[in-house]
Amino acid sequence: MDKAFDEIIGNSHTDSSSNHKVTRYRRRDLRNELGPRLGFAPSDAASRSKDRLYREREEPPLPKRIRISKIPLDVSDYTLDDMIKEFGSPIFSKIFDNKEDRTCIYEFEDPEVLEKIVERYNGHELHNAKIEVEIYQPQRKHSRMNAHNRRKQTAQEHGRDRPGSHYRQKPNRVSKKNKGREKNNTPTSVEALDAELDAYMKG
């Protein structure tokens, strides 16, 4: 794409080294300005990030849902369906089974139904246990991923500053093999050389 822009803009500039640097800087500016006009998508990461944020802002929020939690495990799906049936048919429903209890999610076409369900069943006793009912706003998948990445990056930055962090530079260690080589490479003392010479002469 840079080559195509160079052909459009032209290369009629001075030959001096200082002017050549300025010329390339101006050509880069012109490429950035002409790119959107000629239909070329921006290639830099900053522009892509801005486009992604713009799309996220333009996307409408997901409809609110009702969440019923702390449901005893012995409560059947039929019982839960009967509880919700009086408020109409949900357009979305999902039940999660945990180790200690159950959780169900419902979405209705009429958002006013959610408030009625909260008033009716929040704190309601079901099989000797009080259930919790709340309205929540679901997030889109990419929004959750971005939030997770931000938390992960923050944790990594804090970890680099903490004493004892694995990012801290470790002292250089010499292996046993290298230590043995270092010992063998040490020069022999004068006394040892004299002793070897005497032994050679006597023998």
UniProtKB/Swiss-Prot annotation:
InterPro entries: FoP_C, Nucleotide-bd_a/b_plait_sf, RBD_domain_sf, RRM_dom, Yra2_RRM. Residues 11-20 have a biased composition (Polar residues). Its main location: nucleus. Residues 1-60, 137-203 are annotated as: Disordered. The modification N-acetylmethionine is found at residue 1. Belongs to the YRA1 family. Involved in export of poly(A) mRNAs from the nucleus. Recruited to the coding sequences as well as poly-A sites of active genes. This is RNA annealing protein YRA2. It comes from Saccharomyces cerevisiae (strain YJM789) (Baker's yeast). The lineage of its organism: Eukaryota, Fungi, Dikarya, Ascomycota, Saccharomycotina.
